[in-house]
């Protein structure tokens, strides 16, 4: 299988430098490998996650540290379009610290939905790197 890469959006480096100061590009990509992973491992969330990806990256509600993987953040945003009012998009984003002259980019690793209860647990038990200010 060839690795297909889709340019998704640009991230705000000022927001995402909470993950690492060493962000080499603002480009965010989604590979077919990640799309297949989301479809296989999170089929109930697949459509919502793909619809909400760009908005979640460009305007996150929270960024939480991924304690297991360096230069990786857990990006969370409330799903406004959901019938369920307590659903949030949860995206794993790997930050690119060496784009090799623009050939590499920040990439979506996975994504799924979490409940408000799960979000509250993450906020209590994990390191919150960023919280969107209420306007």
What residue ranges belong to the model's regions?
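Ribonuclease/tRNase effector modules and their secretory precursors
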Residues: 1-135
């Amino acid at each position: 299988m060839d690795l297909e890469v889709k340019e998704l959006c640009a991230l705000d480096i000022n927001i995402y430098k909470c993950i690492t100061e060493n962000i080499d590009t603002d480009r965010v990509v989604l590979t077919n490998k990640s799309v297949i992973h989301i479809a296989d491992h999170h089929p109930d969330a697949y459509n919502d996650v793909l619809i909400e990806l760009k908005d979640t990256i460009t305007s996150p509600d929270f960024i939480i540290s991924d304690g297991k993987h360096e230069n990786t953040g857990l990006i969370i945003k409330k799903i406004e379009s959901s019938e369920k009012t307590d659903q949030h998009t949860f995206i794993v984003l790997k930050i690119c610290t060496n784009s090799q002259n623009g050939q590499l980019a920040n990439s979506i690793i996975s994504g799924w939905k979490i409940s408000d209860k799960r979000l509250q647990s993450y906020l209590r038990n994990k390191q919150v790197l960023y919280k969107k200010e209420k306007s």
